[in-house]
Amino acid sequence: MLSLLSNHILIRDRRFANDRLVQAASSLTEGRNVEKMHFIISQAMRKYYHDGRSRYSMARHIALGSRIIKSRVVERLEYRKILWDAAQTAAQSGARPTALWYYRHCIAFLQDNPWDDNCIDVYYDETLRLHISTAEMAWSQGFNNEALDLLYKVFQHGKTAVCKSRAWIIKAKIYAQLGDHPRSMNSLLTCLEELGIHLRGPTSYEECDTAYNQLKGHLDQTDIMTIARKPISKDITTITIGIVMAEAMSVTFWDDGLTFYKMAIEMMNLHLFRGGFAQICIGCSHLAMISFSRFRDLKLAIKLSELSVSLLDRCPELWTRSRGSVVYNFYIGHLRGPLAATLPALENSVETSLTLGDPYIALITISSMGMTRLFLGHDLVQVEAFCNESAEEINDWASDTRGGASLVTVR
């Protein structure tokens, strides 16, 4: 401590000059000394600094001194919290590689048996959340094998179907991005089965048409605002089913029209007769598209599209609202009004999707925007530049058979 004071690294009134700390650490040349310096800095900052900005600076020193901390400190929950907060801050600001770096160090601070609540410094909820968040961040950066390894641990140790649902969704997204839609859909169907919804059985267009007509009969007799005002279920299983169904719709849309048709009907039935969930705003747009295209049922299609707009306005979830807005404006909106009228909403969706960190949502939104600009006859040089530049941060986007193929075609 006297050495820190004499070198003006620690001020006597307990106010830190963090830039001096960083300079002192970077001036050292021996690896072990640098690591030890970061350890000392992190300990000093933990003792004297407690505001948000200092916690983010502290996280870097904790990460760089992690080996010493792990060898000397048994209970590391506070260190994990600091690293977790830093990862969240980095992710929200768009620094996703930095966020992954913090997540990895946070994982390293877990105990040897991090899933057993009976062990010291082990908390099941924390371990579950950390594995899923790290896997999702690793996938978004193209580290698919790392993500799958983390997800496997969740499947192995997760206590309930709800606990494992997010892991199944991420696994499905990984395979969908790789173009392996059957394995992607299998992951989601397995998740739904664990949640008590069995949709894997064979079906036919005739059976789906019968189910559609039964649903149509109910919707024709129901006031649209009654459906719009239906409260979100408080049952976590029902809420989770809605999330997984929305993901399944996005997978089947691209290469399995029959299953997509079946899913759209089942999603609406679940919302009406089991319990409400926010993702129905996406399901309404899909079902409206089916009514328009397969049955030329303009009355029901318009009713469903109006319901979708009403539900989007009420949707409390940014992710669902962004995705629902893209589905509505690109697949339904142009059937109800001028195509140019959908452009502002798509522009907003592009900006929002890039902050969500989901490569699929970002790519679908960008490709929808590119196609709309092409259809409206915008300057082709600008359209081409948009296609080249907007998706450049998405790994291997041109090989993605969903939004990537559309964007390549426009370009």
Describe the predicted segments one by one:
Residues M1-W101, H105-N113, E194, E206-K230:
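Short secondary-structure boundary elements
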Residues S6, Q43-K47, A63, R67, ...:
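Amphipathic alpha-helical segments of tetratricopeptide repeats
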Residues R12-D13, D51-Y56, G94-A99, N118, ...:
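Alpha-solenoid helical repeat architecture
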Residues A24, R60, L64-G65, D85-Q92, ...:
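Tandem amphipathic alpha-helical repeat scaffolds
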Residues E35, R55, R76, S93-R96, ...:
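TPR-repeat structural position
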Residues K36, I40, R60, K81, ...:
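Primarily a tetratricopeptide repeat
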Residues A63-S71, L77-K81, A176-K262, L374-N388, ...:
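Amphipathic helix-loop-helix modules that constitute alpha-helical solenoid scaffolds
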Residues M268-G275, L287-S399:
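Hydrophobic, small-residue-rich alpha-helical packing segments that form membrane-like cores
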